[in-house]
Amino acid sequence: MKIAKVINNNVISVVNEQGKELVVMGRGLAFQKKSGDDVDEARIEKVFTLDNKDVSEKFKTLLYDIPIECMEVSEEIISYAKLQLGKKLNDSIYVSLTDHINFAIQRNQKGLDIKNALLWETKRLYKDEFAIGKEALVMVKNKTGVSLPEDEAGFIALHIVNAELNEEMPNIINITKVMQEILSIVKYHFKIEFNEESLHYYRFVTHLKFFAQRLFNGTHMESQDDFLLDTVKEKYHRAYECTKKIQTYIEREYEHKLTSDELLYLTIHIERVVKQA
């Protein structure tokens, strides 16, 4: 295997037999090496296969100045997230998370930690991702010796959510705000506190995440037949009253009309989550 390009002493790019470019990492892998030299395969620690060419180029550019410890811990966090969630994450996370962690470490060392305005919401709306974020802080500490604050666990969690939904970070922030707004409408309509450990709460939050994503992408859940909605309106009339409040709010604030199916599923989820409150 030949070196296609030397990125830094620890990172190179190569082209495999299928003609696909790979980013290869290992300590001292490219020391005193140049394009066309043989790769010292014994030094290879990690191979990145990024299918998106634009992401691959951004990743290589980023790696020119990033310490190898930062690259290693970012890859460790991403692999852990994939394992815990059982999901494929968008390749863009290799750029966004590595860049974020590098600057978070630099800021911390200068005493310039940033407060996370969405920490409370992130803890409650993205529990699995926040748990990964907390574990990521341990990984960063073990790899670099830097203790990042809990706020960073929240930021890392949002980067993971971003990669799950294939969204840009500003959209993730807006999605999170809409989820919290809807939960507040339900909470104050019924004057309840949610049982955040219940399965129905978890399912409701998951539904809201994709509902909010459709809202900002300008897409709708297709409507089938109003018969089911009519049945649910009659059976769960209090939950439907709450759904109508949500509908009014969404149409007023975001100019997004809810379909019959969206009203149906919101009502069913609200009925279930309120029963377990």
Curated annotation (Swiss-Prot):
Keyword field contains Phosphoprotein: yes
Keyword vocabulary terms for this entry: Activator, Phosphoprotein, Repeat, RNA-binding, Transcription, Transcription regulation
GO biological process, alphabetically ordered: positive regulation of DNA-templated transcription
Domain named PRD: residues: 65-170, 171-277
GO molecular function term, any single one: RNA binding
Keyword Nucleotide-binding: no
Record's comment on post-translational modification: Phosphorylated.
Family according to the record: Belongs to the transcriptional antiterminator BglG family.
Function: Mediates positive regulation of the glucanase operon (licST) by functioning as an antiterminator factor of transcription. Prevents termination at terminator lic-t.
Protein name: Transcription antiterminator LicT
Species annotation: Bacillus subtilis (strain 168)
Gene assigned in the entry: licT
